[in-house]
Amino acid sequence: MTATIPPLRPTETSSNPDRPIADLKLQDIIKTLPKECFEKKASKAWASVLITLGAIALGYLGIIYLPWYCLPFTWIWTGTALTGAFVVGHDCGHRSFAKKRWVNDLVGHIAFAPLIYPFHSWRLLHDHHHLHTNKIEVDNAWDPWSVEAFQASPAIVRLFYRAIRGPFWWTGSIFHWGLMHFKLSNFAERDRNKVKLSIAVVFLFAAVAFPALIITTGVWGFVKFWLMPWLVYHFWMSTFTIVHHTIPEIRFRPAEDWSAAEAQLNGTVHCDYPRWVEVLCHDINVHIPHHLSVAIPSYNLRLAHASLKQNWGPFLYERTFNWGLMQQISGQCHLYDPDNGYRTFSSLK
């Protein structure tokens, strides 16, 4: 059963009427979620694996047997299905896929290998994002730069930042992947052996799979069977992650003014996508409950979100994926001022 709470009143919940949930503890919100949200069910977890494997197989059959002019459609399907593999690994990284850690680690490495994503590297960096969501200069996922940091950067860096926060937002996860996940200095000494293992796994996969693919199908086969679906996967990775925490209303705060409850409930966006995308990607778009507790498996996110809407509805941001939303994000959410919110690049002129 969901614990029902009375409607919140700013003066009753916070010393700051403009931030009515800032003084709440994260646990206060989690306690209102049904216990069923946290139940791991092996049948549902492995069903998600079967859905992903079936969708990927269907996509590759289409790439092989359908006429060449169908390739854009089969690439989109296959890349979206590969995003589902990432989400399976995502649950493994949060230990919400299986009860045994070794199962999570094994499945996570297998799911991430075709994406050339080092599992432990991602897991550790992603844990940091969850611990410091929307904390200025600490969060490592789409943390917007200040005007001062932007202006102090070299011209080439500013150019790349303009592109990624603007019309080329869909490449953002590629840069994040390449710059963050293979650099050992990004990780604590105690974690580096695990990171090295994960990097070795993806290097081994690439060393075996890529030459085999090129030898048997040529360079065009490499492009057709791996590169294009991989780019579609990164389109979704970039899109999902930027939408998760980037609309003009979302606030980023300095560490001394940061609230976990506010950041996770009121600093995260639920976005509806075409249903086939949500199915293939295992509801990764149902993101608010995931930020409240990473222990919620992906197949229970909708149950948790329904409870949040019932109890905390006024504090939730919900959007629908469309061109207008992406124009708003890429056209307005460029630089950040803690006092006034987002600023556009054009405002610097």
From Swiss-Prot:
Motif, Histidine box-2: chain positions: 126-130
Similarity field: Belongs to the fatty acid desaturase type 2 family.
Enzyme class: oxidoreductase
Organism: Synechocystis sp. (strain PCC 6714) (Aphanocapsa sp. (strain PCC 6714))
Location relative to the cell: Membrane
Name of the gene encoding the protein in the UniProt record: desA
Pfam families: FA_desaturase
Protein name: sn-1 oleoyl-lipid 12-desaturase
Extent of motif Histidine box-1: 90-94
Entry's Gene Ontology BP terms: unsaturated fatty acid biosynthetic process
Key words of the record: Fatty acid biosynthesis, Fatty acid metabolism, Iron, Lipid biosynthesis, Lipid metabolism, Membrane, Oxidoreductase, Transmembrane, Transmembrane helix
Motif residue range(s): Histidine box-3: 290-294
